[in-house]
């Protein structure tokens, strides 16, 4: 509207200027220009209003024989007309150009086609794209439609077919129709789709011939993700796989300094720095679809393949870890009810000796305690819970279990732990240390061959490995209290290397 207003004013000014520049103005009875006051008589020509019979003009005019003239306007109107005429005379071309440019820009903005991202809405429980708004897609129709096809067809005049087509296109509403019914209703028998030959042939297909290849989807049902579980191992159902995102292990920043403080050294050594680099870059989450507890404990698994693990099955865990030296030379029986014989379902009848003759105890059946997990089961559960940074063998786990089951000073930050591992490490010879470290030897020594035969370096590497692994095993034991009979209250340490989070999310033991 503003552009049209500018154009109207420009045209009026141009017309006024053109009349002012005429060499021979219109004739008048008295003068060539109006005679009312001011300089306006020099700028504007005289206007003669001739009376007509059907004149409905209500303006006040002077009576005359053959013509009537208007009363002079007020002085304010004269000044306004003078200013407008002066501006229009000098800048009329610029005003017209600017007004025309504004009109064209406005028309171009309205004619822009914009892409509208479709929204989603639910149809029968399924998310479908919403149909666009009818006003979003604008189609321009040319005014000379009949001539365009005629020129392309090289015809002199437009034929009736072309004219009819042009008429239909110009009258047609090219906006989108309202949303159609859902796809399920399109296949009904009462609409146009079924009348097409292709649709009729499609419904004649015998789906029973390929029933396995036809997918039937219930529109009211929602697809659910099914968590896969591994197949049975040895005709026994394995433990459910843990959720990877729930196992969070915090790693300390100053690991070399913590190790140096525990070992009472002068400062971090190369082995301590290598160990810190290993665990800071390690992913402690278990691999997907890992081996189950029973498969880990099988004869082909890692825990029985090492010679040190085979010797661990002979150790009596009642022996204090400080006396671990004797464990290498003694062949003690396993802890258990070796003197009891099972009678009936759950009755255990101990045997008594009377005059060197064994006789059954007549004081009643022996009610045994609830069965607790063995070292092998605890070790297998520990391997299954985490992707450990170092190799953990059954012998090492057995020693750690004995430390945790003690009734005092079991926290990894206690000096008692250092003494317990000292007796174990100092008793190891060079060949045994190489077997105990296994593949971890290359990582802890960073490939330095000159240190592989150094007994002091190997003992330090094994010591560092045990201290790190016990930190993670200590938290694991207090998460899996179902694997232990009773433990002392857990100590929340301030100086640590590894710390486990999300205690409540670890899987339970069968």
Swiss-Prot record:
GO terms for cellular component: extracellular region; host cell nucleus. The keyword Signal applies. Keywords: Host nucleus, Secreted, Signal, Virulence. The keyword Secreted applies. A motif (RxLR-dEER) lies at residues 47-68. Residues 1-18 form the signal peptide. It is found in: Secreted; Host nucleus. It comes from the Eukaryota. Coiled coil: none annotated. Secreted effector that acts as an elicitor that induces cell death in host plant cells. The RxLR-dEER motif acts to carry the protein into the host cell cytoplasm through binding to cell surface phosphatidylinositol-3-phosphate. Belongs to the RxLR effector family. This is Secreted RxLR effector protein 24. The gene is RXLR24.
């Amino acid at each position: 509207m503003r552009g049209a207003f500018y154009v109207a004013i420009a045209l009026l000014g141009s017309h006024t200027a053109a009349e002012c520049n005429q060499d021979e103005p219109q004739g008048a009875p008295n003068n060539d220009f109006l005679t009312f006051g001011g300089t306006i008589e020099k700028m504007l020509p005289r206007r003669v209003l001739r009376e007509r019979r059907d004149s409905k003009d209500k303006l006040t005019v002077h009576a005359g024989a053959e013509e009537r003239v208007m009363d002079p306007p007020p002085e304010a109107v004269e000044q306004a007309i003078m200013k407008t005429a002066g501006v229009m005379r000098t800048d009329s071309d610029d005003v017209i150009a600017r007004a025309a440019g504004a009109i064209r820009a406005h028309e171009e903005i309205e004619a822009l086609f914009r892409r509208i991202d479709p929204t989603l809405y639910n149809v029968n429980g399924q998310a479908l794209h919403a149909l666009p708004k009818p006003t979003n897609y604008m189609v321009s129709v040319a005014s000379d439609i009949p001539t365009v096809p005629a020129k392309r067809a090289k015809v002199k005049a437009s034929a009736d077919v072309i004219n009819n087509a042009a008429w239909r296109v110009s009258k047609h509403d090219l906006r989108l129709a309202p949303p159609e019914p859902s796809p399920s209703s399109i296949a009904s028998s009462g609409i146009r789709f079924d009348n097409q030959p292709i649709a009729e042939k499609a419904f004649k297909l015998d789906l029973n011939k390929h029933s396995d290849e036809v997918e039937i989807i219930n529109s009211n049902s929602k697809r659910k993700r099914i968590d896969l579980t591994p197949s049975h191992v040895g005709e026994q159902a394995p433990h459910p796989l843990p959720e990877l995102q729930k196992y969070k292990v915090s790693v300390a920043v100053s690991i070399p300094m913590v190790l140096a403080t525990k070992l009472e050294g002068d400062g971090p050594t190369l082995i301590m720095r290598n160990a810190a680099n290993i665990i800071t870059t390690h992913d402690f989450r278990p691999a997907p679809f890992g081996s189950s507890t029973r498969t880990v404990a099988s004869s082909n698994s890692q825990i029985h393949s090492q010679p040190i693990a085979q010797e661990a099955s002979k150790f009596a865990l009642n022996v204090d870890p400080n006396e671990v030296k004797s464990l290498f030379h003694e062949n003690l029986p396993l802890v258990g009810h070796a003197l009891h014989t099972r009678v009936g379902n759950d009755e255990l009848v101990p045997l008594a000796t009377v005059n060197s003759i064994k006789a059954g105890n007549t004081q009643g059946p022996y009610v045994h305690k609830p069965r607790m997990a063995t070292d092998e089961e605890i070790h297998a559960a520990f391997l299954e819970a985490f992707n450990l940074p170092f190799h953990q063998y059954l012998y090492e786990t057995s020693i750690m279990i004995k430390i945790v089951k003690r009734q005092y000073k079991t926290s990894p930050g206690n000096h008692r732990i250092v003494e317990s591992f000292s007796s174990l490490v100092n008793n190891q010879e060079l060949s045994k240390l190489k077997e105990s470290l296994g593949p971890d030897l290359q990582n802890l020594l960073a490939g330095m061959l000159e240190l592989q035969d150094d007994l002091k370096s190997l003992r330090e590497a094994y010591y560092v490995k045990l201290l790190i692994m016990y930190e993670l095993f200590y938290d694991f034991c207090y998460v899996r209290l179902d694997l232990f009979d009773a433990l002392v209250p857990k100590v929340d340490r301030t100086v640590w290397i590894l710390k486990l989070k999300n205690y409540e999310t670890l899987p339970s033991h069968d």
